[in-house]
């Protein structure tokens, strides 16, 4: 029996984001800049991470509260050993209709088949440039874009449904929009361009670095004939368009210029086992890991999750101004703990 619960703003709970690790093999400036996350950076020890059994238990309880979709994030989730074991466990939960994973793609050839065999069917690959030199400068690990493109080709060849996510920063990679759109249009792969967000504390964000949806659309319409597409479901974060000549869709995610707080249905669990109701959360999250390890029953866990959702009133992107951004500096949870 699924309970229907809503938060203070009337938003139901439909999605669960599970961060399985705080580690990543890239050092992108907007997420894990190398100056902060150097070779001597201390990541979470294994006992500080939720176990797969704990994650599956959490997901099962959330499914009883209305969660239908789960997304596995990180850090880089493919760095978590035996991730296919978690995928298999999540696939056995009644009520979960969709399991996705967000990855930088570097380890897809190594782990893609085992994840597919465990039941994973859908992945989002983060790729912020198609130019090799530029992409190397973005990831700060000397990884070429062509390497990731080969991993994407492999993923599609084994049956994974791939979408590509691109975070656009003004003056950094906004010149990649057209060539990337052209490349993935020909590949019949959906690409989504994301406005640069002020997630975490270390990415040097300010409004001047944002390329808005309208600015992107103006650029795109100078090169392609497109039509808008109606939203597929409540809470869809991207504004979708379709190429007139071959029908391939692409999306623009307006995380800054046109917020979607009013339809946000996502609960988030960080890699250290804490609940957050918002990607931009500033207060320390509720420690689900400690709560579970104290010996609570599933019913007690459900009541706690209900209470956390019912007091949720987060709407940071609705309220974002230069002042709120300044006030929240050094207070937000970093992206490698909570995922995207």
Curated annotation (Swiss-Prot):
Its cofactor is [4Fe-4S] cluster. Gene3D superfamilies: Aldolase class I (3.20.20.70). Its EC number is 4.1.99.22. Binds 2 [4Fe-4S] clusters. Binds 1 [4Fe-4S] cluster coordinated with 3 cysteines and an exchangeable S-adenosyl-L-methionine and 1 [4Fe-4S] cluster coordinated with 3 cysteines and the GTP-derived substrate. Keywords: 4Fe-4S, GTP-binding, Iron, Iron-sulfur, Lyase, Metal-binding, Molybdenum cofactor biosynthesis, Nucleotide-binding, S-adenosyl-L-methionine. One of its GO terms (biological process) is Mo-molybdopterin cofactor biosynthetic process. [4Fe-4S] cluster 1 binds at residues 24, 28, 31. GO terms for molecular function: 4 iron, 4 sulfur cluster binding; cyclic pyranopterin monophosphate synthase activity; GTP 3',8'-cyclase activity; GTP binding; metal ion binding; S-adenosyl-L-methionine binding. Residues 8-227 form the Radical SAM core domain. Coiled coil: none annotated. Pathway: Cofactor biosynthesis; molybdopterin biosynthesis. SUPFAM superfamilies: Radical SAM enzymes. It comes from the Bacteria. It catalyses: GTP + AH2 + S-adenosyl-L-methionine = (8S)-3',8-cyclo-7,8-dihydroguanosine 5'-triphosphate + 5'-deoxyadenosine + L-methionine + A + H(+). The keyword Iron-sulfur applies. S-adenosyl-L-methionine binds at residues 30, 75, 126, 197. [4Fe-4S] cluster 2 binds at residues 261, 264, 278. GTP binds at residues 17, 71, 102, 163, 266-268. Catalyzes the cyclization of GTP to (8S)-3',8-cyclo-7,8-dihydroguanosine 5'-triphosphate. Monomer and homodimer. Belongs to the radical SAM superfamily. MoaA family. HAMAP family: MoaA_B. This is GTP 3',8-cyclase. It comes from Staphylococcus aureus (strain Mu3 / ATCC 700698).
